[in-house]
């Protein structure tokens, strides 16, 4: 079975962790028997938020992206396209990307196209008139943002979901949202992680860890405020954040305002291997984010025997906690409840160990890349019937 994977989010020369989950799923599908090639849609124009003095360097970096690469044995073609800037035009990006995508796929040689997200990838596939069965994976952006913020985006999402032979969601909550937007044939295919072969040595200092882009919805600020509530009960606890983004400055300012500047460790964006190594040295993984479709970072931490804390009512944490133990939930945006749960976990090493053991077992049973690969290939086979 020959599969063309089309994605906007995929590792690039200047950003090797962007969409790494899409690459790992492609690897998992290949290892489960599919013949996979990847086409990446990328817009070689700096984001509108780029500072003017940084724009020339950003433009050179984007322009230097090779058109072809091989990563972990998978052939990748990077297809540039021009489009107006986000956010209002995002729903139309499929139309802008379609001509160059059509050229990239004109040779054919595949039985099925797997598009990550309805917009722009699946919409571009449809507009390029690619004559192959279409599978669409929805990871949250289509249902949380694209379909709710622009009429053009909503139309594109409806069109893609309606045309797909199968829509794959990363959690049951996202599957339900996709069906509300016109998807008829759906199933949940969970993403995964690797289980460490050996125990990971923890930091000597009690450490909370979050891995995620520094954006407001990840609620890093809530963790800082909870740490302030616990400042006297747990004076040695540190908070390590792995990731980067627009909230870095505000988080540094908040930490200074709360008197926690010496407790906050901002690691920036790290290569995946280094990010996992640093994250798994922690004692508790905490990410009380909202609009969380899945959250691979939770299961990556749990695989190493770390208990995880997430927000109640979110599709991703609900999917994980529904599969087994090792994760606890708190009401979203409730700093006092978050502080109470962290106080419990930080103050009881036996509880952390028990929850950590259960977390690792939950991942072993339900969230490995091997399981994801098998489920993905089964979905491909069903879409071809």
Residue ranges and their predicted role:
Residues 290:
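Aromatic "clamp/platform" in nucleotide-sugar-dependent glycosyltransferases that forms part
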Residues 322-323, 327-336, 344-349:
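Conserved acidic donor-binding segment of nucleotide-sugar-dependent glycosyltransferases
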Residues 173, 192:
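Carbohydrate-associated surface elements
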Residues 307-311:
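Short hydrophobic beta-strand element within catalytic cores of glycosyltransferases
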Residues 168, 200-227, 240:
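Conserved donor-binding/catalytic core segment of Leloir-type glycosyltransferases
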Residues 161, 269-270, 277-282:
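Short alpha-helical donor nucleotide-sugar binding micro-motif in glycosyltransferases
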Residues 1-64, 70:
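N-terminal subdomain of nucleotide-sugar transferases
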Residues 252-270:
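Nucleotide-activated donor-binding/catalytic signature segment of Leloir-type glycosyltransferases, i.e.
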